[in-house]
Every structure is written in structure tokens, then in C-alpha cells.
């Protein structure tokens, strides 16, 4: 009986936004994995930050503010007036900060919040996501409370991302507001990136996707590419 052939993973392509991708690449390379970044989402500032300024005046109305990512933290606090930043970091704003994972928690602490102001998934959670966060915060919410979810918007200005956590909160009587703090837009792939993508579609490279947006932004500029031999991991 002949042995089943194995396909060696030549490399991993990380498709997260540039700053996030570089962190993932460094972590993978530290484990001996050949990893490269091919960002398929570009993070950009809002064209109109006025909605964020209005929300900043109302932070005390919220029992918690959930940040979907480190990018949400960075762009929210970059546009948050200094007085509101100081009030929150000094504990004069009672809103809890919710984080889906360690990267977002680090960003919150770098923004000035203390660890005791932040709720995040348990350290031994099998996955860092909204489900793991909800397992830790579900018991602290009460009907009638308000929770703000800070996330990104797409190129049309529509909120992007999963609505799972908002659905759980609404189901238990919590009022949810969404706030876009940044835009997620499709990058323009240059010829080098297109060549690498075409090569990775057939050479055993493992694509690492963390959103359906990234997949769309890969396929759209390469309409004639055959992806049937491509290999990928999706984080959710």
C-alpha cells in the first residue's frame, strides 16, 4: 500500500490589515512558520468624525463600550476629546470596556484604561471572539442598560462586522448602539501583490482569513483566477 502523499505548506499568507498582519507574521515566524503579509483590508480614518464626537459627550449613558478590535480602540481614542479620555482613564466614567481578546485589551491599556476597567474572555478560552467575551459578561448586564459597540464601516459607510453580540444583548433587553470609528476599504493590489496571490493560489501556500471581506477583496481584482487548488484557514 502506498503512503498517502502530504502537501508541504510552503508559506502562510496573513490577510489581515497591515499593522495586525505584521504582528501575526512575527508570531508565526517565531514558531518557525514561513509567513508573509498580504493585507486584503485597508484601515482608514472616517470622512466625518462628528458622530463619534456626539457619542463622546454621552459615554456616561452606557454600561459598557465594546471594541471589536485594536483598530477600533486606536481610532476611537484618537478622536475622543482629551477631557473624555481623562475622565474614563481616571474612573470618572463608569462604563466598562469590553474586549474580545488580548490584542484589543493591550490597545485599551495603551490608551490609558486600567485592567480593572476592562472585561475580556478568560485566559484559557478556546477562542478569543464575541462568544468568549459574552460568556464572561452576560451575567453583568441588565434589561434597560445601554451598550455601545465600536467597530468599522465599509466603503459605503455601512457598519461592518458580525452582529452576534448585539443580538445576544438585545435578546436580554439591553439597548445597543453601534458606532463606526474607522473605515475598512479594499486595497489596490499592485502587480507584485497580484503575482504573489496567483502563485499562492496553486503552490500550496496556506491563506489565513479572518473575514469574508478579505476574501471578496482578493477575488474581485483577480476574476479569471482558478482558486480550486488554494488552501485556506478561516478563523471564524
Predicted regions and their residues:
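Conserved beta-alpha
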Residues: 1-235
